[in-house]
Amino acid sequence: MARRYMIDSILYWAQEYHIDGFRFDLMGLYDVETINAVRAALDTLPGGRDILMYGERGRAATAAAPVRGQQGESCHAERSHRHLLRRHPRHHQGRLFHAREPGYVEGRPGSFWDIGGAVAAWCRSDRLPPHAPSQIVSYVSAHDNFTLWDKLLLVRYEKPEFTAADSTALAQNRLAAGIYLTSFGLPFLQAGEEFARTKKGRATATALRLR
């Protein structure tokens, strides 16, 4: 029933509202058969094969039944250039849960080879199952965790001023964009990243209040 509801809803949005892309949160919660069924249903629509479909690889802390798709594997079940897995380790800016840890753009020693793997969409790496470059989404920041700008400043300063211009951080911001925009795979840009968007050092936006 849940699978049918998902398929019917997505087909309705695609047909009635002409939505041409779908992003699945916590895609690891869904079983592979359901995700492939959604893809197959979209492909039956006029122009449906051009509709983008990708998802977050995680599944959060859950006690869901073991029938769910394996984390990081759901989108590899069907080899399709439209069936993308949002997994591009963010070595550009260090580990995302460690605010002070530098990445390649902040000059972390020994990180060059990590960047080499990321630029090539890990096609020659054993970190992921065999895949096409187009099955990888390349990005450095998203709605979760720190913005790129905040991460850059947190690495550089003990008490950063997030709204102040910083020429080094601006150059690092451009370098990060240059890397993933020219990498293999589908580039993903968080809205506002191009003008140094800040959440003032917060890892999430839940604590922010609209004024």
Where does each model-flagged region fall?
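Conserved alpha/beta catalytic core and glycan-binding cleft of carbohydrate-active enzymes
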Residues: 39, 49-206
